[in-house]
Amino acid sequence: MIVSRTLILIDPSSPHGEGGLHVLSDDDQAVTLLLTLDGGSARSLRDFAKAEDIDVSMAGLIYLDQVVNRVSVHTDDIETISTSGSDTVGEIFHVLQHRPVSRVILPASLPGLTGGGLGRLLHACPVPVLVAPRAQAGPAPFRIAS
């Protein structure tokens, strides 16, 4: 049986970047986390990679592993995707073409989804799109672990 997934975009550069995790419901039994490694949302990952002398893709994997630990209290079916593209909307549509997705959840802070980008997504997306509210208090942006 193919399980329909909830696609959640993550923004490690903002305290609101994991807002999508806070709106998961009991209906979201399978989750796909999408992280873009280029553009404004990856700024803190690039800083971490430089400080640790590792590739930004490795920094992304470390960050996604931390997010998976936070999501795992909700579901065991968690998939992670990191992309090198800076076109967030294009990356969402690419995932939608290859995975059974029932809805898309975006953080309110995600760069690249202002103006035309968000409008294009809302107009053309075949599944519901939810913009998660900004968190009152939540996880801080991705920080370098000491």
Predicted regions: what is each one?
Residues 32-34, 79-84, 130-132:
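General small-molecule cofactor/ligand-binding pocket signal
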Residues 50-62:
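A short acidic, glycine-rich active-site loop
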Residues 2-49, 124, 134-135, 145:
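Small/aliphatic-rich secondary-structure junction motif
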Residues 12-16, 84-88, 110-112:
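Short beta->alpha connector loops
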Residues 48-51, 66-71, 114-124:
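Short, aromatic/basic amphipathic alpha-helical patches
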Residues 1, 72-104, 146:
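Structural beta-alpha unit
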Residues 103-125, 138-141:
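Glycine-rich, Arg-bearing micro-motifs that act as flexible, cationic patches
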